Amino acid sequence: MERIMSTVSVVNTNNEKVDEIELNDAIFNREVKEYILHDVVRMQRAAKRAGTASTKTRVEVRGGGAKPWRQKGTGRARAGSRTSPLWRGGGVTFGPKPRDYSFKLNRKVRQQAVSMALSARFQEGNLIVLDNFIMDAIKTKEFASTMKTLELANALIVMDDASENLSKSCRNVHGYRILPAEGLNVYDILLHKKVVLVKPVIESLEKRLMV
């Protein structure tokens, strides 16, 4: 089967066009199905939920052994225990208990979703290919300056091997994240307005996402 390709410009860190590259449309320009993206984002966010909310039932609340007052003759409503959910300080009916919110989607759906998220950014014109991105030292100011030159106010940068210098340089600059190819996910793609692919990572992504 013949591959259909789209051609995009490759720029350097001075925002100058230095080359062109072909992207496989099966990965970077496919039909975007929002319900699949929604399911995968929901899966990712559910996996991060702590699930630690907990309340006590009437059995677990302290006290309540003795009947508060006799059944008849007081003029008050009958009561059997101070731990009743009707009482202030009593137990909670059907309250939350610690639980695992995570659920799984099959691998093929997850791969398709990453490809669709990349395609969405490509179709918007928000997918940028950078020839290389190297920093010799940890310099936040230099990183911020490069982002300004590239006209990127909010971006996810995907690299084959993110250097420690680069990762630490962007840490204190709001709106940016650097991920290795294997860490690329739907939530982070959709969270950022632009996606920057450093050129060598494209081959890795094509191998990973061809399903």
Curated annotation (Swiss-Prot):
Role according to the record: One of the primary rRNA binding proteins, this protein initially binds near the 5'-end of the 23S rRNA. It is important during the early stages of 50S assembly. It makes multiple contacts with different domains of the 23S rRNA in the assembled 50S subunit and ribosome. Forms part of the polypeptide exit tunnel.
PANTHER family according to UniProt: 50S RIBOSOMAL PROTEIN L4, LARGE RIBOSOMAL SUBUNIT PROTEIN UL4M
Protein name as it appears in the record: Large ribosomal subunit protein uL4
Record's subunit section: Part of the 50S ribosomal subunit.
Entry keyword set: Ribonucleoprotein, Ribosomal protein, RNA-binding, rRNA-binding
GO BP term, pick one: translation
NCBIfam families the record matches: rplD_bact (TIGR03953)
GO cellular component labels: ribonucleoprotein complex; ribosome
Protein's UniProt keywords contain DNA damage: no
Family note: Belongs to the universal ribosomal protein uL4 family.
Keyword Ribonucleoprotein: yes
GO MF terms held by the record: rRNA binding; structural constituent of ribosome
UniProt-annotated stretches for the region Disordered: 48-89
